């Protein structure tokens, strides 16, 4: 036999394998929320919740008119603070790595913050449970073995609730979770024909008066009670993702 000596050669390309992230356009629904960036240095922002309207009298013959106070209310909103844990980058890494380690770390911090802020935002918008002015509507479609699928009848029920509350037709936003998007794609030809993600603002389509978006970071609800899981709670088999609508 023959004995040969050789040198194993390796090369570092600088190419990076990154984790999948939510595409920026998939967060287009966040751009539809009015920003109050000028107040973010405060712990709490106070809004005024306008009370009822005055009574309107038609062909009134009784004088003097009744005096009715219109009472407004303070609506405080506490702000969340988001931080990322520090990540060390050594001099050896800066000089030895075949890629820009500092830029990579900064990008991961920005992406992680963006993901968490979006998830917290949609969780905060979603109602805790069904109540007057904040309806929670259960889906009524066929069972897939774990939950009832979403149908156009459920979307119409949501529209009826918004109509009853007097929500203006313009700027009604519906953020569908991927489960509900797939339900509608599977059963509703009209939705399938209109399903087309706008690469600029992330909107899928406009149907039944809603600008519809798709986002998979929506909160979970307990199916039997219709109550939202607390932020950070681990969902069980009896829980399901929800879609969230707002104005």
Regions found by a protein language model. Give the residues of each.
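Long, contiguous amphipathic alpha-helices that act as assembly "spine/axial" helices in icosahedral shell
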Residues: 47, 72-134, 163-178, 212
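A broadly conserved detector of short glycine/acidic/proline-rich loop/turn motifs that flank catalytic sites
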Residues: 51, 83, 180, 216-218
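Residues that form generic nucleotide/phosphate-binding pockets
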Residues: 15, 19, 112, 158-161, ...
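Extended, solvent-exposed, turn-rich assembly/linker loops in the middle of proteins
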Residues: 131-204
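N-terminal "assembly arms/tails" that initiate or stabilize quaternary assembly
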Residues: 1-75
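Short helix/loop capping segments that flank catalytic or ligand/cofactor-binding pockets
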Residues: 55-58, 97, 183-186
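A generic structural signal for short, non-catalytic loop/turn and secondary-structure boundary residues
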Residues: 38-41, 70-72, 80-82, 167-169, ...
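Internal mixed-charge
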Residues: 176-178, 185, 192-247
């Amino acid at each position: 036999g023959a004995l040969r000596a050789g040198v194993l050669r390796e090369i570092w390309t600088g190419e990076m394998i990154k984790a999948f992230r939510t595409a920026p356009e998939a967060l287009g629904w966040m751009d539809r929320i009015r920003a109050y960036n000028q107040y973010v240095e405060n712990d709490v922002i106070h809004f005024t919740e306008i009370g009822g309207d005055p009574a309107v009298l038609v062909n009134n013959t009784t004088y003097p008119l009744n005096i009715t106070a219109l009472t407004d209310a303070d609506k405080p909103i506490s702000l969340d603070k988001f931080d990322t844990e520090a990540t060390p980058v050594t001099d050896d890494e800066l000089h030895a790595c075949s890629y820009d380690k500092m830029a990579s770390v900064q990008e991961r911090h920005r992406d992680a913050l963006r993901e968490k802020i979006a998830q917290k935002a949609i969780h905060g918008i979603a109602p805790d449970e069904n109540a007057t002015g904040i309806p929670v509507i259960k889906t009524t479609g066929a069972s897939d073995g774990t939950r009832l699928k979403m149908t156009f009848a459920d979307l119409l029920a949501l529209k009826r609730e918004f109509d009853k509350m007097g929500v203006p037709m313009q700027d009604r936003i519906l953020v569908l979770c991927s489960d509900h998007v797939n339900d509608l794609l599977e059963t509703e030809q009209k939705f399938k024909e209109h399903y087309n993600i706008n690469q600029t603002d992330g909107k899928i389509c406009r149907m039944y008066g809603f600008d519809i978006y798709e986002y998979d970071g929506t909160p979970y609800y307990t199916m039997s009670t219709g109550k939202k899981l607390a932020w950070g709670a681990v969902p069980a088999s009896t829980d399901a993702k929800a879609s969230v609508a707002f104005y």
